[in-house]
Amino acid sequence: MPATVLITGGNRGLGKGLVATYLSTPDTTVIATVRDPSKCESLSALPKALGSNLLLVKLEVTSKDSITTAIGTLDTHNIGSIDVVIANAGISGPTSSLAEAPVSELQRYIDVNAYGPFELFKAVLPLLRSSNSGNKAKFVCISSAGGSLAAMYNFMPISAYGASKALANFLVKWLALDNKDIIIWAQNPGSVDTDMARDGLDLAKSLGFDLSSLSFTSPEESACAIKKLIDGATTEMSGKFLDHDGSELAW
């Protein structure tokens, strides 16, 4: 059955891997939101399976108006429903000392990583409820094990990033409780080999942290694993915080 999938932050890293993975699935319309569609030639050149197509939409996740406008433009492309939304856009990086970090730094992470997916959910909810796939629509928030209070002792100093992901997890849990007609969960993709992750790793090393044991998966591998979880999603997954292998993570 034809499917419509929306992925934020689709121009690089895991987002691009997700776009490529869904475009390789027949009869799939992929809506990739990006900050500047004119600079996404590599996305447009991705291989497409029979019946699949790509729509690039400009969206800035820190702006409620931008999110509302972007979702509003879908009607002009005859898109009246969405089956899967993956809130992938985000920022990451270490914070050397939370006590010394300005509130503005913490707010920047929260605006992108927590409030962004929250505002996106509100904007796409009518389209998710209009899904005619025969199954419940899905909203997946790409989170991080760094947002787990139980796991924070094993991480490099990512207090601002971790706090924003912990807030995102809380919002996802509450949205799932409020909207039982949609399957909603927070998804840890694992350690994905992206430019953003490498930049954070280099900075952490410069601060003296030994991360030699850390291993990465490719964006494509991670995207395939996430798609497999989405394809098999059940109502029981809603409101949970899942690891890359589908096991449940502690909040």
UniProtKB/Swiss-Prot annotation:
The keyword Metal-binding does not apply. One of its GO terms (molecular function) is nucleotide binding. The active site is at S143, Y161, K165. The keyword NADP applies. One of its GO terms (biological process) is terpenoid biosynthetic process. InterPro entries: Fungal_SecMetab_SDRs, NAD(P)-bd_dom_sf, SDR_fam. NADP(+) binds at L14, T33, E60, N88, K122, Y161, K165, V192, T194. It comes from the Eukaryota. Griseofulvin is a spirocyclic fungal natural product used in treatment of fungal dermatophytes. CDD domains: carb_red_sniffer_like_SDR_c. Pfam families: adh_short. Its EC number is 1.-.-.-. Transmembrane segments: none annotated. Coiled coil: none annotated. Pathway: Secondary metabolite biosynthesis; terpenoid biosynthesis. One of its GO terms (cellular component) is cytoplasm. Short chain dehydrogenase; part of the gene cluster that mediates the biosynthesis of griseofulvin, an important antifungal drug that has been in use for a long time for treating dermatophyte infections. The first step of the pathway is the formation of the heptaketide backbone by gsfA which is initiated by priming with acetyl-CoA, followed by sequential condensations of 6 malonyl-CoA units. The resulting benzophenone can undergo a spontaneous dehydration to form norlichexanthone. This is Short chain dehydrogenase gsfK. It comes from Penicillium aethiopicum. The gene is gsfK.
